[in-house]
A protein has these predicted regions:
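N-terminal helix initiation/capping motif
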Residues: 1-33, 102-137
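Short, well-ordered loop/turn sites that connect or cap secondary structure elements
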Residues: 9, 44-46
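Hydrophobic core residues within well-ordered beta-strands of beta-rich domains
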Residues: 11, 24, 50, 63-65, ...
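Short conserved beta-strand and strand-loop elements enriched in small hydrophobics
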Residues: 13-17, 48-63
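Short, solvent-exposed secondary-structure boundary/capping segments
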Residues: 37-40, 74-89
Length: 137
């Protein structure tokens, strides 16, 4: 399933990005099982491939992923409408880490007005391990 089918959750988790010898710190603004919008002072260029570690505060664990920059706000304004940062698409991420993101996104979004099809898409990732309770009939 493509990133456009998963809803984006406003989860603000600390991120450390490694790009060769350069290390960049940031924070996720939105996150889903396939991609993340990361706010950082110096976004990378399009198509750069990075190694990243996302710290999941509530679970006291981190997620490691290899990702590609698919959008970068390097030169635009840095304001509430268009915050300085970049969107990365996960190229390599373990299925367990993808499930952690899906579960946290689901928990964050289930009380909001989100298309039920999109919530069900998150559930398909989580249900393999039976980590959420089924919906009441």
């Amino acid at each position: 399933m493509g990133a456009e089918h998963y809803p984006k959750a406003n989860l603000k988790w600390p991120v450390v990005i490694q790009n060769g010898k350069r290390s960049i710190e940031g924070v996720t603004l939105t996150l889903n099982p396939n991609q993340a919008y990361i706010r950082c002072a110096k976004p990378l260029k399009l198509y750069e491939v990075i190694e990243m570690t996302i710290n999941v505060p509530d679970l006291d664990r981190s997620i490691k992923a290899r990702a590609e920059v698919v959008f970068s706000n390097i030169h635009g304004p840095d304001d509430q409408i268009s915050q300085r940062g970049m969107i990365v698409r996960f190229l390599e991420i373990s299925s367990d880490d993808r499930k952690v993101i899906a579960k946290e996104a689901f928990e964050h979004l289930k009380s909001k007005e989100v298309d039920s099809y999109q919530l069900e898409a998150l559930q398909t990732i989580i249900l393999e391990k039976g980590e959420i309770e089924p919906k009441a009939a």
